[in-house]
Amino acid sequence: VLLEWTKGMNVPDAIGKDPVKLLEEQLQKRGINVQIVAMCNDSVATLMAHSYNTNTACVGVVLGSGTNAAYVELVSNIPKLHTEIASPTMVISMEWGALGNHDHSFLPVSFLDEEIDSHTLNPGRQYLEKMMSGCYLGEITRLWMRHLRQENKLLSRTPLQNCLFCERYCFDSPLCTTILLDDSEEREEIRSILESFGISDSTTEDRNTRSSTPLLRALLD
């Protein structure tokens, strides 16, 4: 059954229910004759897919909108398993995006991570996922750019009232890649991105992603 939602999704009526049955019911209502034979975790599916190519695959990792990992474990090492099974091994979904739930003192949490967490639907949970996954990287970058702007180290001529500094999740994660890959002399891709936020007076230094310039720090620090 579905225990909880993550990554901003919120459908309370689905909590505690079997998502496969819910999906099948909706498919049937639409006259779509599909029978779901298995629901597979993405990291488990990644491991299984690669296992078709090599029988030595032992870990599957997903780094996408969220993050997770699955690995092959000896059944003898799984004390929670009370049912006897024929196989000596089992694939375990680690759900490592939840590392830091309730206690994140062992993680390198910054003030940016704390702000991200405080404005989510599940504060205090999925801490590692919020620190590194694609769903949040754009917002982490935006918050860091806002911090640099507040210290007049980036886009100092742009008002703090600009949507880039005020509107949550307006800076999509793929923009980080676009910025880092822009090697044109005048950083035209970066200029275009800034102009989409109404910033038309950026300096060359603002747009420069070489060395330790402000925009590079905003993306990578």
Predicted regions: what they are:
Residues V1-S51, N55-V59, V75-L107:
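Glycine-rich phosphate-binding loop and adjoining helix at the ATP-binding site
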Residues E25-Q28, S51-N53, V59, S76, ...:
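ATP-binding/phosphotransfer module of carbohydrate and carboxylate kinases, centering on a glycine-rich
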Residues A70-L74:
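Short beta-strand-to-turn element immediately C-terminal to the catalytic PLP-Schiff-base lysine
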Residues C58, V62-G66, E95, M132:
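Short glycine/serine/threonine-biased micro-segments
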Residues S43-V44, V61-G66, D221:
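A short acidic Gly-Thr/Ser loop motif
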